[in-house]
């Protein structure tokens, strides 16, 4: 009996969704670049793991950027693990780059977050590197056109966000511009989420000031535009992750677009993370779906949040254990000017999931 055409189409679409989805974040493997690799010659670009040919070309033509890109990859790893430390999915699989598990291989909510964070991180790192004078191709950001406010004056060195966004997008979006990398739906999803990450970075630009005046009177303040820390951007993106929208690839007019699965009468909002495939609950270990499980994960007995023992342990229960903590105590200030402390030890009770 021959399969019906619509069944075949559905199977092909499902297969496409599972193929090559994480191609755009393989560059995070740069976090493992040996410090001994100088990255001062173009032939070094071929030795870097996780890059597509377009990124290798960008490396060769912008060699001075690569230390900053490596730094960005390392910052993504740290920021993701910190942001999800209290969740069942704790971003541990990101450290397997470039050989990800299915939690990041597929078009999941988790991959949406990592794409957004990666795009934000590389632009953030480049913008900051311009400010610190580490890149010969850029300097401080432009002086804002609006007045700084009473008692303030523009000065200092602003983070060069425009240059960071330009060069960051060229590098992080390059894999999605390659023709043979998965389905069109996946490409649209990845590009959309990367732009959401850059949007979150733009929103983090704020006025920072330094006081001047006699005896700290702060009669005049020198101000500039600076980016928040990447961890703050990650926190913003985590909020968007929690409210991410599941989408489908459907015709709208003469072209196909990503539209919300449960409300396909409107286009996807520019500010929302989107995903194509639902994730497992990450309760049990199952590498087929990219789940490490939560067995032996630490939980908080008194919390009502995602790190609570009830939620983290998925109802399986938990085991208590005692831990000895050494900390500074009985600190005393001495004139002038130092502090002495004693070292105290106390026992705390902790809990891990069964």
UniProtKB/Swiss-Prot annotation:
PTM summary: Palmitoleoylation is required for efficient binding to frizzled receptors. Depalmitoleoylation leads to Wnt signaling pathway inhibition.
Localization per record: Secreted, Extracellular space, Extracellular matrix
GO molecular function: cytokine activity; frizzled binding; protein kinase activator activity
Glycan attachment sites: 40, 90, 160, 300, 304
Zinc among keywords: no
Tissue specificity comment: Expressed in fetal lung, kidney, adult heart, liver, skeletal muscle, and pancreas.
GO-annotated biological processes: adrenal gland development; artery morphogenesis; atrial septum development; bicellular tight junction assembly; bone mineralization; canonical Wnt signaling pathway; cell fate commitment; cellular response to mechanical stimulus
Gene3D superfamilies: 3.30.2460.20
Function according to Swiss-Prot or TrEMBL: Ligand for members of the frizzled family of seven transmembrane receptors. Probable developmental protein. May be a signaling molecule which affects the development of discrete regions of tissues. Is likely to signal over only few cell diameters.
GO cellular component, as recorded: cytoplasm; extracellular matrix; extracellular region; extracellular space
Tree of life domain: Eukaryota
Gene (UniProt): WNT11
Lipidation (O-palmitoleoyl serine): 215
Keywords assigned by UniProt, alphabetized: Developmental protein, Disulfide bond, Extracellular matrix, Glycoprotein, Lipoprotein, Secreted, Signal, Wnt signaling pathway
PANTHER family given in the database record: PROTEIN WNT-11, WNT RELATED
Family: Belongs to the Wnt family.
Protein name, per record: Protein Wnt-11
Disulfides per UniProt: 80-91, 130-138, 140-157, 209-223, 211-218, 283-314, 299-309, 313-353, 329-344, 331-341, 336-337
Entries under InterPro entries matching the protein: Wnt, Wnt_C, Wnt_CS
């Amino acid at each position: 009996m021959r399969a019906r055409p619509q069944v075949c189409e559905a199977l092909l679409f499902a297969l496409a969704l599972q193929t090559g989805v994480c191609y755009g974040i393989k560059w995070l493997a740069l976090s493992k670049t040996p410090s001994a690799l100088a990255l001062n010659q173009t032939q070094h670009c071929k030795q870097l793991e996780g890059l597509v040919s377009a990124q290798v070309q960008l490396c060769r033509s912008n060699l001075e950027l690569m230390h900053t890109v490596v730094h960005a990859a390392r910052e993504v790893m740290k920021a993701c693990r910190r942001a999800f430390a209290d969740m069942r999915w704790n971003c541990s699989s990101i450290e397997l780059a470039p050989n990800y598990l299915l939690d990041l291989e597929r078009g999941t909510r988790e991959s949406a977050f990592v794409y957004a964070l990666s795009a934000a991180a590389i632009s953030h790192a480049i913008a900051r590197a311009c400010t610190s004078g580490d890149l010969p191709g850029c300097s401080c950001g432009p002086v804002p056109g609006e007045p700084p406010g009473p008692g303030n004056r523009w000065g200092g060195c602003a983070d060069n966000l425009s240059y960071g966004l330009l060069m960051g997008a060229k590098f992080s979006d390059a894999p999605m511009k390659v023709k043979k990398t998965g389905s069109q739906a996946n490409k649209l999803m990845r590009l959309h989420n990367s732009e959401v990450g850059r949007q979150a970075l733009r929103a983090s630009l704020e006025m920072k000031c330094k006081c001047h005046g006699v005896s700290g009177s702060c009669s005049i303040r020198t101000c500039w535009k600076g980016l928040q820390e990447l961890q703050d951007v990650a926190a913003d993106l985590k909020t968007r992750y929690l409210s991410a929208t599941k989408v489908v690839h459907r015709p709208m007019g003469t072209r196909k677009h990503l539209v919300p699965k449960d409300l396909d009468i409107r286009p996807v909002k520019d500010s929302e993370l989107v995903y194509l495939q639902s994730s497992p609950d990450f309760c049990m270990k199952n590498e087929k779906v990219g789940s490490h499980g939560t067995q032996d994960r630490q939980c908080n007995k008194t919390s009502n949040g995602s790190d609570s023992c009830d939620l983290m342990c998925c109802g399986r229960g938990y085991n208590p254990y005692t831990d000895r903590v050494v900390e500074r105590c009985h600190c005393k200030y001495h004139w002038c000017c130092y502090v002495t402390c004693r070292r105290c030890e106390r026992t705390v009770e902790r809990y891990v999931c069964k």
